[in-house]
């Protein structure tokens, strides 16, 4: 049975005080409202990780939004996997489309980040996805497959099974274009098919694949009903406790 995962990505939002308030609200609501088989994750700014980890309960796990690919050293401004682990982090987003676009992160860099995260007991939330131009050119499936191959396929089957994948249809995020349930399911099925080509159908069927294309309370139920969509990587809606919890109740 694949894990159901609803992960919130706060991005660069919320001061420490605001973050503590939101995290407390989510944790308290989750305790009473979210089904036991749904894994809730909040991926929050570095400055709030240690403090928030102390105010949540066992219904919510803490995630980071990035990690550096080395254990330690002279890398000013970076945060390592051992540091994240030391403050209670369980998950880490790797390869978000914004990191790829604004910071030029490459598939090889992301492969290194995945490796070091797993070595330190963190669960990678690995992001992949295509732009509108790539989709319209008909190369979107090959493009996403290449992201997966170059960043994940060096892993052993045992390590690979610890990864959670998030599909981000970049063309449907903040563009006014909406991905239908059918389009989302098609890409998730193609991703699982590609995973099976490397690791076999049994392993591929264990991997949770989240949808990261503007999931909200009003579209979550349809998306989460799709055969190959196991959860969501939530952006804006994760900044409102009620919306985030309502999405988690949509299975």
From Swiss-Prot:
One of its GO terms (cellular component) is cytosol. Its EC number is 5.3.1.1. Substrate binds at residues 9-11, 174, 214, 235-236. Transmembrane segments: none annotated. It is found in: Cytoplasm. It catalyses: D-glyceraldehyde 3-phosphate = dihydroxyacetone phosphate. Pathway: Carbohydrate biosynthesis; gluconeogenesis; Carbohydrate degradation; glycolysis; D-glyceraldehyde 3-phosphate from glycerone phosphate: step 1/1. SUPFAM superfamilies: Triosephosphate isomerase (TIM) (SSF51351). Belongs to the triosephosphate isomerase family. HAMAP family: TIM_B. Homodimer. This is Triosephosphate isomerase. It comes from Cytophaga hutchinsonii (strain ATCC 33406 / DSM 1761 / CIP 103989 / NBRC 15051 / NCIMB 9469 / D465).
């Amino acid at each position: 049975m694949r894990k159901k995962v609803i992960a919130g990505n706060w991005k660069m939002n919320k001061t420490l005080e605001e973050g503590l308030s939101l995290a407390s609200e989510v944790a308290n609501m989750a305790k009473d409202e979210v089904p036991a088989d749904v894994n809730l994750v909040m991926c929050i700014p570095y400055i709030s990780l240690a403090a928030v980890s102390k105010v949540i309960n066992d219904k919510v796990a803490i995630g980071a939004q990035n990690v550096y690919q080395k254990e330690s050293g002279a890398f000013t401004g970076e945060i390592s996997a051992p540091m994240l682990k030391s403050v209670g982090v369980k998950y880490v987003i790797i390869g978000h489309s914004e990191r790829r676009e604004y910071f030029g992160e490459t598939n090889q860099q992301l492969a290194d980040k995945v490796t070091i995260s797993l070595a330190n007991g963190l669960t990678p939330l690995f992001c992949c996805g295509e732009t509108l131009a790539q989709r319209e050119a008909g190369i979107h499936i090959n493009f996403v497959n290449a992201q997966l191959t170059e960043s994940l396929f060096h892993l052993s089957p045992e390590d690979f099974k610890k990864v959670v994948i998030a599909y981000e249809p970049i063309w449907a995020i903040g563009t006014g274009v909406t991905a239908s349930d059918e389009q989302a399911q098609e890409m998730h099925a193609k991703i699982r098919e590609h995973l099976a080509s490397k690791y076999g159908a049994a392993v591929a069927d264990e991997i949770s694949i989240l949808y990261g294309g503007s999931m909200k309370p009003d579209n979550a139920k349809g998306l989460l009903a799709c055969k190959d969509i196991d959860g969501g990587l939530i952006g804006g809606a994760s900044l409102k406790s009620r919306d985030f919890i309502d999405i988690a109740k949509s299975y």
